[in-house]
């Protein structure tokens, strides 16, 4: 496979038939190929992620790196028709390449997101399948498991930083916010996320999605956490506490 340089800084490899696809890979991964996206390739160094991922995510370990491999899967009713294929609209619009490039851009801006390690798509006629590998952050737990702790301010500040960078998260919930052992906040899962031209409505939508998630996870305790997070968000945004 001949490698090209992607604007994200990754190496871009195009696969010949019959694979009919391409991949992006961090130079740290060396001369890697499609095997990166096959859990069987890692043997005992791969294990399923306990929660989320629609049974399509694994913790994997390579030579000098640890990551999370995720295959893109549909949810909801449409999954009954097509579990893992998407309509082809050009390479730049594949879910894997878009998420990889968004994460790379966010990392370059110093935002608290995992490093993208590799992304791929496999095209078949008018459809394609896709997968991504992102850096595994050691020693973290989801916000959903830490609501008894006074974390609303650092969580709010992380969201404000994301929004100030013009980034919209497609599913900001209590499991896509991770808390490190040092108290650092990380934001994950930017599938379908975008950057640029973030509207007030999109920001409010992110916040309300998180509120629903917190209440679903912890009921009244989740609502109390949300109210403190909301006030911290608006204070960090610079407009003071909002009603």
Label for each model-derived stretch:
Residues 166, 171, 189:
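Conserved catalytic-loop position in the HRD/HxD motif
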